[in-house]
Amino acid sequence: MTLAKVFSQKLRELGISSIYIGHERPSLQSLAIKMLLKNYGLVEERREGMLITQDHGIKLISGKGTETSRYTFRKGGKKVSIHLPEYPKMVIDLGLFEFLNEEEKEKTLLQVDLCLSVIRKFLWDGNLTVVGKADYVLGRANIVQSLSLSDEDNPVILDPYGDVVATDQILRDHNVFVIGGIVDKGRRLDRATERLALSRGYSFPRVKIQLRGSIIGVPDEINKILEIILRVKELDQSLEEAIISLQSKSDKISRLLHDVQLYGMEVLEEEARWLRADDKVIEIVRSRLGKN
């Protein structure tokens, strides 16, 4: 359950159906994050404004208008006590970080940094854990040296060479997702997640995310893997839709090249529509195949 949904349920319990938000971003998720991490909350005062949006049944009002609210969201306001979602827990394990060269370390930490903004789209910092780098600071995410999990956590580790193929249901049924702080596909340290799992003694399932039977075209950035999982679990998107939505142009090109080489040029247009690839991507694919 997203933080926005938890927040909206608590507001309704308190009899609050609308909030005047001033210049704040019109999103309950954004308001809840700001309330948790900064000195913001609700002040009981009557304000009039224009209905900007209705988010999870709560009216968000701003500017001038005829809509009324008894509560204003602002700095110094009273915080609303909400039950923070314990699951899902997203874990990034940096156990192989010291084996990376400097360029790889820089890219890895950039992707991990981006995970904070991703987790805040759905949950909050407390649902993110970084393992194996004691001097690392990432908002209010949990920074630990080793991971302690129970059977109730029902964990899996994401590995492009794992023996379990991810499905929508598998992702929705599990509570904890471990992502290795390194990219496996075609990089210097091949099958690094398998190596990480062995070194850590992780005995739980190694799950691979595929797109119609292949890992080609599946984004491999840590932050995007995390968001794919959260879109399936928290927004009820299909796994395929989440993958395609987060593909870069490079991901689309790689998949189109793979499929055209496998099935022939006649599939290019249909595959491009499936991947929502634009004309520029199709042009690049044709050029690389010498078909211009």
Curated annotation (Swiss-Prot):
Its EC number is 2.1.1.218. One of its GO terms (biological process) is tRNA processing. Its main location: cytoplasm. The keyword Hydrolase does not apply. It is an enzyme of class 2 (transferase). GO terms for molecular function: tRNA (adenine(9)-N1)-methyltransferase activity. Residues 72-253 form the SAM-dependent MTase TRM10-type domain. GO terms for cellular component: cytoplasm. It is found in: Cytoplasm. Belongs to the class IV-like SAM-binding methyltransferase superfamily. TRM10 family. This is tRNA (adenine(9)-N1)-methyltransferase. It comes from Sulfolobus acidocaldarius (strain ATCC 33909 / DSM 639 / JCM 8929 / NBRC 15157 / NCIMB 11770). The lineage of its organism: Archaea, Thermoproteota, Thermoprotei, Sulfolobales, Sulfolobaceae.
